[in-house]
Structure formats: C-alpha cells, structure tokens
Amino acid sequence: MLFRSPDIVKSYDYDSTLKTRGLGAKTTHEFLNQLEKEFNNMVASVEKYGGFYIGRYETGNINQDTPVIQKGNTNISSQTWYNMYKRCKNIKGANTNVETGMIWGNQWDRTLMWLIETGSKTKEQIADDSTSWGNYYNATFEYVNSSGSTATKNEGSSTRIPTGSAEYTKANNIYDLVGNVRDWTMEAGSTYLRVYRGGGYDLSGGSYPADYRYYNNPTSSSNYYGCRSALYIK
C-alpha cells in the first residue's frame, strides 16, 4: 500500500460523483488541483510561521455545516470522508486570517514526533502500544459521560466517550489522539482509499498504536469514524 498526500482516490473521485459532492471541484482534475493547492498553502504557512495548530479535541457537531472543536461533544462520527473534508473548512467561521481543514497525514506524523520530543510520550507509546493513553478496547480509565457523571470505562469493553472527557487520554493538552473514534486524514492510501489514524474504541492499543496507518473507502460512515481538524495562518 502506497500512502500519499495530496492525491485523489481514483475509485471514488471521478467526474460523475464529484459533481454531486459539493466539494468545490466537479472533475477529477479539478479536485486534484484543489488538493495540491490546499497542501502547498499549508506547507508554505508552516515554513513561514513555524508550525500549525491541531484540534485539542476530535471534531464535534460533524453532521452540521459548521463543526466545532469542543469538549464534551458526542456528535463526532457517522459521516463520510467527503462530508468531513468539506465541513472542516468551515470551522474558521468568518476569520479570514486562517484556514481550517481535516488534518493531513504529515501533520499527524509531526504531532506524534512532537509528543516524543517534548517527553510527553515515548517512542514505544507511539509506535508499539498506545493503550496507556487512549480509549481502546483493552484500556480502563475514568471519564465524564454525556450526563456529566464520572463513569468507568472497563477493560474489554467498547465505549465511545465524549470529546476531552478523560484525563487518561490527554497528551500535551490534546485529547483522544489515539483511541475513541478513528480519525480520517487527507492522506490517500494507494489509488482507491483514504487513510485514518489513531486507532479506535473497539480496537487494541497494541495492534493499532498512534502511528499505525489503515484505510477504508471514503464513502464509508459509521460510529467508528471521525476526524481531527487542523488550522494554519494564511
């Protein structure tokens, strides 16, 4: 499997479907140019300003036209990659000085490296087993449920939790980077799939650690899939 940013996925990003997705581009060629421009603008901003901002929480209100980055949000899944891609752009609101969007694969990788560089996590916690800091099937920890009460997530249970509801899942003030919902990224897997990162609440932290890449078709939507947003200065 080859992983690439930016790129289209040919099995889904063809002209007849792009016309109906509301992505801005209506042909495969236009969409590829659009993705390349967005990627290049992000890289230019990082080079100029020295970095980017990653959402503290997984993207919430994701079934709305304008999502949010908000603690305690439970509306974090069950949308296709296409819907999340176009909606994450609206997080910036009326602010014309920044751009927001779904996180790129290289931004995800740089965030993981930053966690290691700052001593927040070890290489082993990133690459081998992320159970100790994520909402995985094999993890146990306390969290605040949607009713505002403290609850225990038991080992051997698959429990999706509200965003930012467990100190157990925090790393450098970023919550749920691993475990909870799988986070779609902008990265393409081969020529027909989109990549998601960070494991999931139904998975093992040893089998699906923070840096593990896996993929699905971008039209999939279920309780397991969400996304992480990022922001850069224009």
Language-model features, listed with the residues they occupy:
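Active-site-proximal beta-strands of protease catalytic cores
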Residues: 178-186
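Eukaryotic short linear interaction motifs
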Residues: 61-63, 182-183, 191, 203-204
